[in-house]
Regions:
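Chalcogenol-based redox active-site neighborhoods
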Residues: 1-148
């Protein structure tokens, strides 16, 4: 896992933006100059992940007031992310969340941050990245342990 005080690995990947648009060139470096909470989660359409993402989404305004951008990453495709957003919360979806979800089908991003579970998906990990792109704080949880 990358450590605090080190530069956050940059990446360019497909993503679903808050308005639902799919882009193929979402890049972490575009957020230099503001804080970023980059968080990894195992998979879309699972039991614990929607609750974590919806909890983050409820606090987006608080993050924005502090000039902090939330960004989620999993090994799902951008199309799966889009379908998850379109699925009603009552049916295991997440609805129109207000932060980007990055697709990491190749698991290069997950690997560059050192948060890949031996069975393939990302562990539950969060990174606080400062305005200069340096990691200031990290948390890492095994798959069965949710975040609060």
């Amino acid at each position: 896992m990358v450590s605090i005080c080190s530069e956050a690995p940059n990446f360019k990947a497909p993503a679903v933006l808050p308005e639902g648009t799919i882009v193929n060139d979402f890049e972490l470096a575009n957020y230099r100059g503001q804080y970023v909470v980059l968080f990894f989660y195992p998979l879309d359409f699972t039991f614990v992940c929607p609750s974590e993402i919806l909890a983050h989404d409820k606090r987006v305004t608080e993050f924005e007031q502090r000039n902090v951008q939330l960004i989620g990453v999993s090994m799902d495709s951008q199309f799966t992310h889009a379908a998850w957003r379109k699925t009603p919360i009552s049916k295991g979806g997440i609805g129109p969340i207000k932060f980007p979800l990055v697709a990491d089908l190749t698991r290069k991003i997950i690997g560059s941050y050192g948060v890949q579970h031996p069975e393939g998906p990302a562990l539950r990990a969060s990174f606080l990245i400062d305005k200069e792109g340096v990691i200031q704080h990290t948390t890492l949880n095994n798959l069965p342990i949710g975040r609060d």
